[in-house]
């Protein structure tokens, strides 16, 4: 799916790491919340509250989940799962566009 129809968008952006990650929250008709964003070239560490599925929709990244020793590469059309109350490191050499699915 290349777009979401019939959604509400929170106008104010979520800006993290001095602008290296910017996203917008979208709310689907059924109340489901997602964020749609971009991570600019950088190496960042994110903490999670709820479980997340990160769906890549453009670019690529390397990811290391908390407790793992190896980095894995993900690109356009690929997803990775992050447990709740955890963290992950992400490294991008190019803009990485994503949709974050919660729960």
Curated annotation (Swiss-Prot):
Query: Would you say which domain of life the source belongs to?
Result: Bacteria
Molecular-function annotations in GO: guanosine phosphorylase activity; purine-nucleoside phosphorylase activity; thymidine phosphorylase activity; uridine phosphorylase activity
**Class of this enzyme:** transferase
Keywords in UniProt for this one? Glycosyltransferase, Transferase
Q: Does the keyword Chaperone apply?
A: no
Q: What is its EC number?
A: 2.4.2.1, 2.4.2.2
**Record has Glycosyltransferase as a keyword:** yes
Catalysed reactions listed for this entry:
a purine D-ribonucleoside + phosphate = a purine nucleobase + alpha-D-ribose 1-phosphate; adenosine + phosphate = alpha-D-ribose 1-phosphate + adenine; cytidine + phosphate = cytosine + alpha-D-ribose 1-phosphate; guanosine + phosphate = alpha-D-ribose 1-phosphate + guanine
A GO cellular component annotation here is:
cytosol
Task: Indicate the family of this protein.
Answer: Belongs to the nucleoside phosphorylase PpnP family.
The task this protein performs is described as: Catalyzes the phosphorolysis of diverse nucleosides, yielding D-ribose 1-phosphate and the respective free bases. Can use uridine, adenosine, guanosine, cytidine, thymidine, inosine and xanthosine as substrates. Also catalyzes the reverse reactions.
Stored HAMAP family:
Nucleos_phosphorylase_PpnP (MF_01537)
The protein's name in its UniProt record: Pyrimidine/purine nucleoside phosphorylase
């Amino acid at each position: 799916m290349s777009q979401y129809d019939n959604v509400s968008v929170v106008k104010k952006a979520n800006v993290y790491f001095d602008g290296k990650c910017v996203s917008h929250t979208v709310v689907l008709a059924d109340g489901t919340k997602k964020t749609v964003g971009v991570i600019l070239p950088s190496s960042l560490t994110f903490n999670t509250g709820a479980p997340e599925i990160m769906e890549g929709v453009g670019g690529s990244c390397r990811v290391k989940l908390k407790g793992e020793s190896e980095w894995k590469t993900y690109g356009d059309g690929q997803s990775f799962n992050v447990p709740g109350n955890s963290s992950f490191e992400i490294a991008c050499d190019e803009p990485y566009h994503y949709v974050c699915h919660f729960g």
